[in-house]
């Protein structure tokens, strides 16, 4: 009886963790999605948005060669997984009054994939 219960518990736990790898973020898919972002976020000095190379772990409004909005300057964020996720999903909710003219990306998996891609930018 105890062996049977332990076996069932092991199978249940194994099933729970079987899909974990399948849910991992996909940087290559994130790169495909980033094409829309690249319309503004480029390495050109006259770009509409700031350069996102090295954005992961960087403080918000940290690039000296980009003119950030006052709300972004006051945001005092560090671009980690949580802050990037919130901002990509709904920029105005995360930093009210920022200038990014983007409504947000609603699919959570797509957001995670974009973040995985941003982590590759150095």
Give residue ranges: language-model regions.
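Bacterial N-terminal signal peptides that target proteins for export
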Residues: 1-11
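Periplasmic/extracellular electron-transfer cofactor-ligation site
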Residues: 25-67, 73-78, 89-98, 120-122
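Alpha-helix N-capping/helix-start residues
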Residues: 27, 81, 107-108
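Short, exposed beta-strand-loop hairpins at the edges of beta-sheets
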Residues: 103-107, 113-120
